[in-house]
Amino acid sequence: MEIARSQNDGIIILAPSGRIDQDTSAAFQAALSGEIAGAAPASVVVDFTAIEYISSVGLRALMIGAKESKASGGKLAVAALR
């Protein structure tokens, strides 16, 4: 899994690619948490266009990110879920 980062009008866009599973979920969670903490309150969009698979562990990482974002007064959105 790789994660591309961009920013548009103050909104951080993270675009992971590949698989988010047991082996990669920690890196995904660290990247997401880092963006949320680094620019709190942050608006973050996670673009799943290039994700082939996300396991329950990956969904857990996303939920942790959502809770962290809410706690810091930010917003987290997801795009292109398949």
Model-derived regions, located:
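Amphipathic alpha-helical interaction surfaces in cytosolic regulatory modules
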Residues: 20-82
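Short beta-strand/loop segment at the start of cytosolic alpha/beta domains
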Residues: 1-15
